[in-house]
């Protein structure tokens, strides 16, 4: 494909101040959007450029999944791999994400008993892939009968609680973290395990004093901090500790929603699961948005869904990943539409708001001049009108078509 060209469509949802363009066009040059507007105006300004006409396919920003575990935990969850084949599985999962319309991931690095992750090597590999991956380095506690603590610094080796609050370890975690993901697990997590295997999932791991200290260490280094948390007690602690981004927030109350808004906390909701409590419902998503909180929807890939939850509607509990981002967003997005929100605001939950979580909102997540030409052409509005990834026909990253389903 030429380095400079025009794409046109009967409908372009920009997720920007431009809102929705009908019979619109985008001018791409060297992977960047250099102009956008009505097709007639664009065509008259750039008469010599090739035009790619998507006709009735809807053009939107490509999707962003700002909370995943694709490199450490997902490969052995999805495939019967060993360490020898772990990296092949990683590649397969990334390709599946691209085929699902996702061109940016927020990836957690927690330490894992299954795989010794070389973060520098993975970061170098990520630079060669046609997508953006931002890494959050974390510590984690898994809720087995005997709690298991791990950190991104210590890798495969389990550690005791004192290591989680060790300043030297924390300094390394902070230095390596690229965005506020699950830097600290306030509750023990069930991870992606069956409930009976993790009886202590949900247990509070830190004192308020310890959490305050960790948060302050991040802020003193000029970095934001994110946390894994669910339940009223844990969420209160997160707010008290000045955590910047709450991941999950399952079980949040109306009172805590108001407090989170007062503190300008962003919440990454995970309707698929990820904690010891029931995941975010469509009603919860609506309440958060109505309060004015910036929320992003993410998959926490890969997780077995609760098949009894009506807003998920899965036939089995096999692990799900980026391919269900639209599906798990659908019911909440429909509620927001019924509440009168514009489709651009609604679509921001799986595009621009994820970019804000990753700190990339000046580069990706919307379609306007100066942004990367990361977009998809689909048979409807992702998450709102379509939930099947087969309806995403083409995926572009930095102006190049990386997935083409014709």
Indicate residue ranges for each PLM-predicted region.
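Active-site core of metal-dependent hydrolases
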Residues: 187-296, 303-304
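His/Asp/Glu-enriched, well-ordered alpha-helical/loop segment
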Residues: 220, 286-378
């Amino acid at each position: 494909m030429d380095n400079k060209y025009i794409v046109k469509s009967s409908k372009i949802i920009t997720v920007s101040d431009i809102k929705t363009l009908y019979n619109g066009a985008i001018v791409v040059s060297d992977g960047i959007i250099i102009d956008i507007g009505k097709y007639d105006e664009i065509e008259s300004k750039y008469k010599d450029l090739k035009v790619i006409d998507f006709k009735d396919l809807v053009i939107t920003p490509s999707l962003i999944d700002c909370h995943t575990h694709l490199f450490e935990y997902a490969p052995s969850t999805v495939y019967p791999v060993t360490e020898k084949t772990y990296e092949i599985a990683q590649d397969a999962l990334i390709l599946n994400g691209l085929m699902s319309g996702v061109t940016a991931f927020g990836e957690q690095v927690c330490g894992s008993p299954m795989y010794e992750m070389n973060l520098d090597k993975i970061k170098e590999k990520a630079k060669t892939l046609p997508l953006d991956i931002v890494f959050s380095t974390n510590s984690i506690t898994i809720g087995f009968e005997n709690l298991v603590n791990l950190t991104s610094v210590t890798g495969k080796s389990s550690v005791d609680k004192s290591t989680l609050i060790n300043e030297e370890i924390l300094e390394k975690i902070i230095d390596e973290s690229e965005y506020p993901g699950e830097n600290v697990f306030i509750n023990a997590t069930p991870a992606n395990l069956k409930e009976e295997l993790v009886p202590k999932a949900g247990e509070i791991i830190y004192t308020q004093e310890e959490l305050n200290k960790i948060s302050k260490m991040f802020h003193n280094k000029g970095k934001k901090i994110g946390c894994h948390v669910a339940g009223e007690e844990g969420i209160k602690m997160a707010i008290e500790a000045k955590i910047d981004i709450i991941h999950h927030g399952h079980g949040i109350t109306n009172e805590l929603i108001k407090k989170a808004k007062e503190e300008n906390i962003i919440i990454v909701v995970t309707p698929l699961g990820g904690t010891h409590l029931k995941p975010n419902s469509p009603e919860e998503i609506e309440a958060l948005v109505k309060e004015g909180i910036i929320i992003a929807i993410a998959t926490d890939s890969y997780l077995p869904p609760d098949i009894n939850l009506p807003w998920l509607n899965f036939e089995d509990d096999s692990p799900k990943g980026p391919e269900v981002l639209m599906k798990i967003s659908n019911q909440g997005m429909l509620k927001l539409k019924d509440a009168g929100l514009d489709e651009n605001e609604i679509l921001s939950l799986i595009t621009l708001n994820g970019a804000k979580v990753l700190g990339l909102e000046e580069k990706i997540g919307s379609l306007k001049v100066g942004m990367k030409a990361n977009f998809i052409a689909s048979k409807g509005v992702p998450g709102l009108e379509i939930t099947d990834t087969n309806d995403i026909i083409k995926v572009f990253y930095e102006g190049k078509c990386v997935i083409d389903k014709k």
